[in-house]
A protein has these predicted regions:
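Extended, charge-enriched "interface" segments that sit outside catalytic cores
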Residues: 1-110
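A short, hydrophobic C-terminal helix/tail in secreted or cell-surface proteins
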Residues: 225-231
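Glycine-rich phosphate-binding loops that contact phosphosugars or nucleotide phosphates
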Residues: 100, 113-224
């Protein structure tokens, strides 16, 4: 059989399209055969069953007694109970309200008319997620017209030279910079180091760090994170 034709036949057999999601997956070139596929059916059924349990709110992290529900944040309607659903909606509404007030100037820094820049401090997913969104949605400014929103900078490691470069780029605009510190636990060492270095940068310019900083953390650690910011 012609090689191209055999590839096409295999593609037709193994191309997977999920109705309603717009997601398609081509596994035809992965090199497995039918016997392997058949042998995996039991394992796949177990995996799908475990996923269904997670969707239903099963505890997946016994150390912290936590469920896994990152995707509930995108669609609170699928959260396993009303309490979680209401908490998610409440927090999302609060975030939207805060963001709107920052962008329209109702929340402003102590020494400037409004915030023009955002400095996000986080490690791992606390920085990677926002970086992905910022780079994907930033867009390209039109000629002689700047983009709306805050120009965003990231401190996502403990490299002192990297931090110094960012502080240099911000320069005098540090007084117009909103600092966002993200740590689920409220005590991530790398994130804390970045926050302390940034606080020192503010101090060197006689700026009130606490007046321009906000923390995103787990509810259990809110007071500790606030004490660190205000300290």
């Amino acid at each position: 059989m012609n090689k191209d034709l055999s590839h096409w036949i295999r593609f037709l057999e193994w191309f997977c399209q999920s109705d309603g999601t717009g997601v398609s997956l081509d596994i035809s070139r992965m090199g497995f055969d039918r016997s392997w596929w058949d042998s995996m059916q039991s394992s796949m059924a177990n995996a799908l069953g475990d996923m269904e349990k997670l969707d239903g709110g099963a505890v997946a992290n016994p150390d912290e007694n936590r469920m896994v529900g990152h995707y509930w944040l995108r669609n609170p309607d699928i959260a396993p109970n009303d309490e979680i659903r209401e908490k998610i909606c409440e927090n999302l509404n609060s975030l939207h309200h805060f963001s709107e007030r920052v962008l329209d100037g109702r929340i402003k820094p102590p020494n400037a008319k409004r915030f023009s820049r955002l400095l996000l401090i986080g490690i791992g997913g606390s920085a990677l997620g926002p970086q992905l969104l910022y780079q994907a949605l930033e867009g390209i400014p039109e000629k002689e017209k700047s983009l709306s929103g805050l120009e965003t900078f990231f401190i996502d490691n403990t490299d002192p030279q990297g931090m110094a470069r960012i502080y240099k780029k911000l320069g005098d605009s540090l007084k117009e910079t909103l600092v966002l510190v993200i740590s689920k636990s409220g005590g991530t060492v790398e994130t804390r180091n970045g926050m302390l270095e940034t606080r020192n940068a503010f101090k060197s310019k006689n700026l009130n760090f606490a007046g321009q900083a906000v923390a995103v953390t787990c509810l259990l650690y809110t007071s500790d994170a606030a004490d660190e910011l205000l300290g």
